[in-house]
Amino acid sequence: DIQMTQTTSSLSASLGDRVTISCRASQDISNYLNWYQQKPDGTVKLLIYYTSRLHSGVPSRFSGSGSGTDYSLTISNLEQEDIATYFCQQGNMLPRTFGGGTKLEIKR
């Protein structure tokens, strides 16, 4: 199986900040990288698919980039509603494995 690693398990930022969350695959996944958002109430939403394509209805402050084994999700102008845990998932090979998640919190 392809292992997905999110080295930062939690991240604290201020409203209005630009935040970048990273993900690394154990082998080349040919840009088949998705990002999911899990809200504190458990709701899960697909944000980005195929590295950089925004899912329908996702605000343009979310963007994705990367290639090969290294990928990132950037949130520009962080809003309160963005407080959640973010997971990367590779879709290049079955099983479609996930990273361990990065929990984003507001800096106090």
From Swiss-Prot:
A GO biological process held by the record: immune response
- Name one cellular component (GO) term: immunoglobulin complex
**Region (Complementarity-determining-1): which ranges?**
24-34
Q: Which UniProt keywords apply?
A: Adaptive immunity, Disulfide bond, Immunity, Immunoglobulin
The record ties this protein, via CDD domains, to: IgV_L_kappa
Where are the annotated segments for Framework-2?
35-49
S-S bonds: 23-88
From the UniProt entry, list the residue stretches annotated as the region Framework-1: 1-23
Q: Map out region (Framework-4) in residue numbers.
A: 98-108
The protein's name: Ig kappa chain V-V region HP 93G7
